[in-house]
Amino acid sequence: MTLPTTQNGPLRHFLQFKDLTASEIGYVLDRARIIKDKFKRYEPHMPLHDRTLAMVFEKASTRTRVSFEAGMYQMGGSVINLTSNDSQLGRSEPIEDTARVVSRMVDIVMIRTFEQTRIERFAAHSRVPVINGLTNEYHPCQILADIFTYIEHRGSIAGRIVAWVGDANNMSYTWLQAAEMLGFTLHVSTPAGYQLDPARIGNPPPSVLKQFKDPMQACQGAHLVTTDVWTSMGYEAENEERRKAFADWCVDAEMMAAADPNAVFMHCLPAHRGEEVTGEVIDGPQSVVWDEAENRMHAQKALMEFLLLGEIH
């Protein structure tokens, strides 16, 4: 166990996409490519030996757990997995107290929880970097992986159009932060009553955000079309109501045909074929979903390396 400090100066967290600068995001994405190349060559990359990652899950997960756990082991570290069922988090211990204790024993923490304020309270009392594995408000690790995937397949995302079709959830708000930082335009189409919250987004210029009532218009000329489930965790009681409201927001072959001829399709998974996307699209030639899922691991490895070791030259 090392002292709970980083080698790149002041303590840094990744609670929102904008917690890193555009140049730092670019560095992490470059490192993700290098780290992935080493992984594909079976070349060991273990800069985090003797480091420990604590993963705190208050929301269930498949990809987040596997990608962080496998990634930390591959970099030579160890992992502790905590849930509300097997820790004091489920027994009313204040999150601040958990942060004070856990961060004295590990080197970095990933939390997947409900309210953004909860992870912010943890980070405010942590002595080590804290990563947002998902909250109701933001999903920055997923967008980091998505942008890495786009670059891998099509090159720079700057100047491109990303079309978001479906619920204005944590993914869409994180895409908006990325668009503001990295110089691409976000097209958003949602059903009435499920739009982006004006109080949260402010007044971004059309070069950053355009909102559409018609999902076909949102997809017009897009270089990346992406979506998510219609009913996120915590909203299960609204499932039937949402299925009716979102019926016309299923990404299908017609929407992809409206996009740029070289457009790719992404989905953060799990997917419900026949709801937010057709099987023809997610299993078709424009889909890069499976690379996108794998790239969670590589992007997060680069992120953890950066938060703990700083930039490596």
Swiss-Prot record:
InterPro entries: Asp/Orn_carbamoyltranf_P-bd, Asp/Orn_carbamoylTrfase, Asp/Orn_carbamoylTrfase_sf, Asp_carbamoyltransf_Asp/Orn-bd, Orn/put_carbamltrans, OTCase_ArgI. Its main location: cytoplasm. L-ornithine binds at residues 170, 228, 232-233. It is found in: Cytoplasm. GO terms for cellular component: cytoplasm. Carbamoyl phosphate binds at residues 61-64, 88, 112, 139-142, 268-269, 296. Pfam families: OTCace, OTCace_N. GO terms for biological process: arginine biosynthetic process via ornithine; citrulline biosynthetic process; L-arginine biosynthetic process. GO terms for molecular function: amino acid binding; ornithine carbamoyltransferase activity. It catalyses: carbamoyl phosphate + L-ornithine = L-citrulline + phosphate + H(+). It comes from the Bacteria. Gene3D superfamilies: Aspartate/ornithine carbamoyltransferase (3.40.50.1370). The keyword Transferase applies. Pathway: Amino-acid biosynthesis; L-arginine biosynthesis; L-arginine from L-ornithine and carbamoyl phosphate: step 1/3. Keywords: Amino-acid biosynthesis, Arginine biosynthesis, Cytoplasm, Transferase. SUPFAM superfamilies: Aspartate/ornithine carbamoyltransferase. Its EC number is 2.1.3.3. Belongs to the aspartate/ornithine carbamoyltransferase superfamily. OTCase family. PANTHER family: ORNITHINE CARBAMOYLTRANSFERASE, MITOCHONDRIAL (PTHR45753), ORNITHINE TRANSCARBAMYLASE, MITOCHONDRIAL (PTHR45753:SF3). Reversibly catalyzes the transfer of the carbamoyl group from carbamoyl phosphate (CP) to the N(epsilon) atom of ornithine (ORN) to produce L-citrulline. NCBIfam families: orni_carb_tr, PRK00779.1. This is Ornithine carbamoyltransferase.
